[in-house]
């Protein structure tokens, strides 16, 4: 296992309250659920397990191009996982180690957090907060992070 340096801001008051080391053979349904509500015009998010798997201690998320011969449209299937029902906290920090593809016209990898008030079921949007820790827009030179209120 590669050693990753601890962030400088961590102190002894922090306690690990949620983690997944992906050491099993399949995605743990007690920690993760598929989210088919996220989509884009040419991407159909799916709960198809062919798009997500555990491999060598890593979560692998894929998208698959749908070959529609003769069509000018390009569609693909992707997957979106959420911890909505298993990881809700008011304070703290989150971290992830990831290998991100930079493919033009391909996937849109992202790592978001959302407040409970802004997602299923849609409650008062005035209280919704979304933090885009990162979003990759198919360019090796562009990485976005945003706070939405």
What are these regions (language model features)?
Residues 1-149:
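GH16 jelly-roll
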């Amino acid at each position: 296992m590669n050693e990753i340096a601890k962030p400088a801001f961590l102190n002894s008051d922090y306690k690990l309250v949620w983690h997944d080391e992906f050491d099993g053979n399949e995605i743990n349904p007690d920690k993760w659920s598929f989210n088919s509500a996220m989509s884009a015009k040419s991407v159909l998010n799916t709960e198809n397990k062919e798009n997500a798997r555990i491999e060598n201690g890593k979560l692998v998320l894929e998208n698959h191009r749908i070959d529609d011969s003769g069509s000018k449209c390009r569609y693909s299937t992707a997957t979106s996982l959420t911890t909505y029902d298993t990881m809700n906290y008011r304070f703290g920090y989150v971290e992830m180690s990831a290998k991100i593809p930079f493919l033009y016209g391909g996937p849109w990898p992202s790592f978001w957090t959302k407040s409970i008030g802004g997602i299923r079921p849609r409650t008062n949007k005035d209280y919704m907060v979304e933090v885009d820790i990162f979003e990759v827009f198919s360019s090796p030179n562009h990485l976005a992070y945003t706070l939405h209120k």
